[in-house]
């Protein structure tokens, strides 16, 4: 799968998932906790805003910081959606009951080596990008 295809799938997956947030649909506003590069956060939220006529804003933090915020905000969530970051904190948040279940229809397009993970844990997370951390 090419990087261009991967980036397109990332954007499509994010837009599809963002469209299902009830808060955004009800109030015309969306707050996204974003744990990827700032430029990606900006492009995804801008594309969503344009496509769905919703005021989408993002708060950029590392995955660990976002997990801490979500834990602290359990009784009064301040964001509608968490996009990006490493998978372990997403799985931990799901186990703690901090995330709503959602399965992306685009999971069928995930590379074969990640299919089993998505079949087991895909109600709370989805592979949206792949990045080398070292060689």
Question: What is the predicted role of each segment?
Answer:
Residues 1-11:
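Bacterial N-terminal signal peptides that target proteins for export
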Residues 77-82, 100-134:
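A structural signal for short loop-to-beta-strand junctions that line the ligand-binding cleft
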Residues 13-16, 88:
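Short, linear, compositionally biased motifs with a strong N-terminal bias
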Residues 31, 134-135:
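Residues embedded in well-ordered beta-strands
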